[in-house]
Amino acid sequence: MALPNKFLLWFYCFAWLCFPVSLGSQASGGDAQIAASAELESGATPWSLLQPIDERDRAGLLPPLFKVLSVGRGGAPRLQPDSRALHYMKNLYKTYATKEGIPKSNRSHLYNTVRLFTPCTQHKQVPGDQVTGILPSVDLLFNLDRITTVEHLLKSVLLYTINNSVSFSSAVKCVCNLMIKEPKFSSKTLHRALYSFTFNSQFEFGKKHKWIEIDVTSLLQPLVASNKRSIHMSINFTCMKDQLEHPSAQNGLFNMTLLVPPSLILYLNDTSAQAYHRWYSLYYKRRPSQGPDQERSLSAYPVGEDAAEDGRSSHHRHRRGQETVSSELKKPLVPASFNLSEYFKQFLFPQNECELHDFRLSFSQLKWDNWIVAPHRYNPRYCKGDCPRAVGHRYGSPVHTMVQNIIYEKLDSSVPRPSCVPAKYSPLSVLTIEPDGSIAYKEYEDMIATKCTCR
């Protein structure tokens, strides 16, 4: 027993001697940390604190609002898209979203994602015949690796851009022959078999048209649904001028140089939780809104016998009320020890009231302007301020908020008071350049705070 007792005595002495040293080191370390944080706050802008130090700590440093956008930040230099394709997507963004990036409510489309892909490889062939207007087939390969498993294809379009220097004196009719080439390998012969599909389309374009759109949904939808991310297609164009309007035109001569290699546009529905689901909001906007408050307001006006009984009871209550008022008037108006200003303070809202505050920033401050094309500025807004003791209906707070206030004041001050937090949000439309050079239009849910509450 002597050996264990000596060991315990030695251990306690050692701990007693070391405790002040460790405490002092912790205190000095804490002072240094406070000084460093004060220096950081005084010399740095708020958004410099959002810059991740390490890629592993990015999700922990950035607030949830920017986690979605920070995924595309950094990494290898991005490929720059074609200027014509970028111009088309900018026009699409202006059609679907406001200047502040809020999706327009008058748009009833079901897709929340639009991706534009340019061909990664192209097999050039001999120029087209200027006399017959026939353009030889061109082989194109599109890489669709940016499509995620939660994105479902709704519509696909081939986009041809027209050279601005070309002017049309008459309408031009074109026929497009498209063939999808899908290589497959047999387990026995290991030879590649070529599966082809032919798609014909007739369309016209005139003086004001700068783009030609060809719907190829029926061909690409089964391929994209089967998670095929490499699309090899062969396209042939035959374009001729309208002979009825210009019979003197020699063999319908048409300048084929106005057609540049096409881009592929996919209209997708992102089913993830972070995406904005327009159909969901449209469904709830069209529903008849009659909540429990309306039901209570309807039942507050009795009819028939209930109304007569309520009238008699209100008459008795009125007489009792008069007696109460007369007795109250006989009392002194204000007691000697009563402070009128303190009495009215409980009915006033705090000066620093819970409300929305603006926080306007540009993506250039975050060094994200090299891949976020639109919007240029962003105002996420935030909620800040004190919650009143008696939370009114304008905050839309539940009864639990008032109960929590009572617990804090009367029972246990360790229970936190209700906090000022966002209650409603609006979505945000973002146009970005992907690492592979493709362009993506996406609508994100819950990106701009629009209402505050106390909870």
UniProtKB/Swiss-Prot annotation:
InterPro entries on file: Cystine-knot_cytokine (IPR029034), Growth_differentiation_fac-9_C (IPR015617), TGF-b_C (IPR001839), TGF-beta-rel (IPR015615), TGFb_CS (IPR017948)
Protein name: Growth/differentiation factor 9
A GO CC term assigned to this protein in UniProt: extracellular space
Species name: Papio anubis
Disulfide bond is among the record's keywords: yes
Disulfide bonds: 354-420, 383-452, 387-454
Gene3D superfamilies: Cystine-knot cytokines (2.10.90.10)
Processing after translation: Phosphorylated; phosphorylation is critical for GDF9 function.
Keywords: Cleavage on pair of basic residues, Cytokine, Disulfide bond, Glycoprotein, Growth factor, Phosphoprotein, Secreted, Signal
Remarks, miscellaneous: Ovarian physiology and fertility are controlled by endocrine and paracrine signals. These act in a species-dependent manner and determine the ovulation quota in different mammalian species. While humans, and mammals such as the cow or red deer, normally ovulate only one egg per cycle, other mammals such as mouse and pig can ovulate in excess of ten per cycle. The mechanisms that regulate the species-specific differences in the number of follicles that go onto ovulate during each reproductive cycle are poorly understood.
Spans annotated as Disordered: 305-328
